Curated annotation (Swiss-Prot):
Name used for this protein in its record: Guanylate kinase
Keyword Kinase carried by entry: yes
Enzyme class: transferase
Catalysis: reaction(s): GMP + ATP = GDP + ADP
Annotated transmembrane regions: none
Assigned protein family: Belongs to the guanylate kinase family.
Top-level taxonomic group: Bacteria
Function according to Swiss-Prot or TrEMBL: Essential for recycling GMP and indirectly, cGMP.
A GO MF term: ATP binding
Binding site for ATP: G13, P14, S15, G16, A17, G18, K19, G20
Cellular component aspect of the GO annotation: cytosol
Pfam families referenced in this protein's UniProt entry, alphabetically: Guanylate_kin
Keywords: ATP-binding, Cytoplasm, Kinase, Nucleotide-binding, Transferase
Length: 205
């Protein structure tokens, strides 16, 4: 057998769609998938741990990392910056380990330009009404922030055209299983591994 390069799994969706909860469930059931920890300038939410959920850094530190070219992608979302550190991800993929990125649409677009072979998955809410209920239910945003996120949701959903797959998140466990199915399918995709397969059997002649 040959060692398959790891899959870069990029999961996005509008705020409140539940992408973070789905990713937690996916990681809980699949210890072979490594979560890429993003850096952000926003303040931690209740229960979030530095270095686990995000690297919470200052705006000055973030700008320094941009200057050094240490991000695979970065973007400004609302009033904060988010970025994906590059080195650790590339190392994991070369070793054959799958890496999961939960990022916003701006960041995903940059990732696709650099890593077009990635697997891009868009998480949709069952409805816009349910989306708003989820954002309100988090209790982490002010009323103005809630309205800002909700008003952006439709524009964000229109960006689905840049993705490979979509899932409607009505149930977290079901959604995680759907992503597992996508991973299985991608790992046996001829277009992804055809050259390696042909080379393997050529060497055996």
């Amino acid at each position: 057998m040959f060692v398959k390069k790891g899959l870069l799994l990029v999961v996005s969706g509008p705020s409140g769609a539940g992408k973070g909860t789905i990713c937690k469930e996916l990681l809980k059931e699949n210890d072979t998938i490594k979560l890429s920890v993003s850096a952000t300038t926003r303040k931690p939410r209740t229960g979030e741990v530095d270095g686990v959920n995000y690297f919470f850094i200052s705006k000055e530190k973030f700008e320094e990392m941009i200057e050094k070219g240490e991000f695979l992608e970065y973007a400004q979302i609302y009033d904060n910056f988010y970025g994906t550190p590059k080195a650790a991800i590339m190392e994991c993929l070369e070793k054959g380990q799958d890496v999961l990125l939960e990022i916003e649409m701006q960041g995903a677009k940059q990732i696709k330009e650099v890593c077009p072979e990635g697997v891009f998955i868009f998480v949709l809410p069952p409805s816009l009404e349910e989306l708003k209920n989820r954002i309100v239910g988090r209790g982490t945003e002010t009323e103005a922030e809630i309205e800002k996120r909700f008003s952006c949701a439709y524009e964000e959903i229109k960006m689905i055209k840049d993705y490979d797959y979509f899932i409607f998140n009505e149930d977290v466990k079901t959604s995680a299983k759907e992503i597992e199915g996508i991973i299985s399918s991608e790992k046996n995709k001829v277009s992804r591994y055809k050259n390696i397969i042909i080379e393997k059997f050529k060497e055996e002649l």
